[in-house]
A protein has these predicted regions:
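Catalytic PLP-binding core of fold-type I/II PLP enzymes
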Residues: 151-183
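Conserved PLP-anchoring active-site segment centered on the Schiff-base-forming lysine
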Residues: 71-89, 118
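Conserved C-terminal alpha-helix-loop-beta "cap" of PLP-dependent enzymes
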Residues: 74-78, 268-269, 273-341
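Conserved core of the PLP fold type I
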Residues: 54-73, 103-110
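Conserved N-terminal alpha-helix of the aminotransferase class I/II PLP-enzyme fold
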Residues: 13-61, 83-84, 88, 94
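PLP-dependent aminotransferase-class I/II
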Residues: 99-137, 141-144, 151-158
């Protein structure tokens, strides 16, 4: 059985595992105050050219989204997101559970448009009853989106300008940030992403780590008592070294970006195979997630030898499925897939 089910089905990249083994017997302080966390933070700030930024490490994506949104919003505020956004669909109501409404907007290929965000905010304030409503207090987007698509520099700049005009923070979910940055279609540099938003995170779980996400407040704009609020939400890891060592390794010798480049190269090869075999794409993704429309019978047949992710029902006879690549994807797996197709 070969698997393209997700980008976190394997363990950690071997270099990360080696770092964890080499440091295993060191006695280090807890809660992210160790030397490896400190080194990782400096390397991240250098990579994204935000010397005044502050970096914090959390364990997983849903936890990170909930912590960021709930600490940055007032109790009466909600977060604007695409109706297909991760916080809208695939986090079991985690944001709502923290007391904040997700204000869903229509999207195109997973992306929000600046004009739609602006209209949402303007419509809110033009309503005479807006004091009885949930205030739009943040904009959430992901890079790449749930569909693997990317915001261009112009699109992200326009969204950033709307947020700054209305003085609400822009939050970029970077669970797969490396794949977005290394995509051939990307025209945003890491430092431009940091400059245009108010908070973002660098995904480790889906980009080679065992677990872990690095939250970055690039403009010295961390919420008050942020570490205390992380602790209050049960998200402060006592053995913070686990995260620090991994991110220190990921941001040594460009490993994070090399991992991402490899996954993109494998995804390009995957696309070639599906095109060669005459399959239809649900949309053209420039990153490591590829969405294919399969006949239901073919899907059933293929699933006997290949693992992939269900995405959505296309019609009565077809289903959209997802194939994802990662650091562990190799040429031989794609060769096998080609035979099964």
């Amino acid at each position: 059985m070969i698997s393209f089910a997700s980008d976190y089905i394997a363990g950690a990249h071997p270099v990360i595992m080696q770092s964890l083994l080499e440091t295993n017997m060191e006695n280090l302080s807890g809660y992210g105050t160790d030397q490896y966390c400190a080194q990782a933070k400096e390397k991240i700030k250098q990579a994204f050219q935000c010397p005044d930024g502050e970096v914090f490490f959390l364990v997983g994506g849903t936890q990170t989204n909930q912590v960021i949104i709930s600490t940055m919003l007032a109790p009466y505020e909600g977060v604007i997101a695409a109706k297909t956004g991760h916080v809208s669909v695939h986090e079991a109501g985690a944001i709502e559970y923290s007391g904040h409404k997700v204000i869903e907007l229509e999207e195109k290929d997973g992306k929000l448009a600046a004009e739609d965000i602006k209209k949402c905010i303007e419509d809110f304030y033009s309503d005479d009853n807006h004091e009885h409503m949930v205030y739009p207090g943040m904009v959430y987007i992901s890079f790449p989106t749930e569909y693997g698509t990317l915001y261009s520099k112009q699109e992200l700049t326009e969204i950033s300008n709307v947020c700054r005009n209305y003085e609400i923070p822009l939050f970029i979910d970077g669970a797969r940030l490396g794949y977005g940055i290394e995509s051939k279609e990307n025209n945003l540099r890491p430092e431009e992403i940091a400059e245009l938003c108010d908070v973002f995170y660098i995904g480790g779980t889906k980009v080679g780590a065992l677990c872990g996400e690095a939250v970055v407040f690039p403009h010295h704009n961390t919420p008050k008592h942020f570490v205390t609020q992380i602790k209050q939400r049960g998200a402060l890891l006592a053995k913070g070294r686990l995260l620090g060592i991994q991110f220190d390794t990921l941001f040594t010798d460009h490993l994070y970006f090399e991992i991402s480049k490899h996954a993109i190269a494998m995804a390009e090869r995957l696309k070639e195979v599906f095109h060669k075999k005459g399959y239809t794409f649900f949309l053209e993704s420039p990153t490591n997630q590829q969405f294919i429309i399969l006949e239901n019978e073919k899907m059933k047949e293929l699933s006997e030898n290949v693992e992939f992710g269900f995405w959505e029902k296309y019609d009565d006879n077809h289903t959209v499925v997802r194939f994802a690549t990662s650091w562990s994807t190799d040429e031989s797996s794609i060769d096998q897939l080609e035979e099964y197709l």
